[in-house]
Amino acid sequence: MKFWDLEITFIEKFTVRIFQEISKLNEKFNSWEIDSTTLTNELFKLLILSVNWETDKEKIINLILDMESIEDYSKLNEEIAKRINDSVSNLKKKN
């Protein structure tokens, strides 16, 4: 799936609900109802939901974070939050 400059390829499956939410966000972005920063923030919120629903830690690590190991989900969430901050900062610099 491609939204703005983001390529979403790291989640193998979406629930129907998440897919519907992503479609709504894409429509809002394409109709200028939301800006790129809002789109990015909302997409990352959905990503975090998807990650937290995943039960296979190694799959999460390999698909998203490229981390070698993880001790608990709090570390995972910290890493995701860091990457969100980095991504949003990069998007703001582009704008």
Enumerate the predicted regions with their spans.
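Short, surface-exposed, charged amphipathic helix/loop patches that serve as local interaction elements
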Residues: 11-95
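Short acidic-hydrophobic surface loop/beta-edge motif
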Residues: 1-6
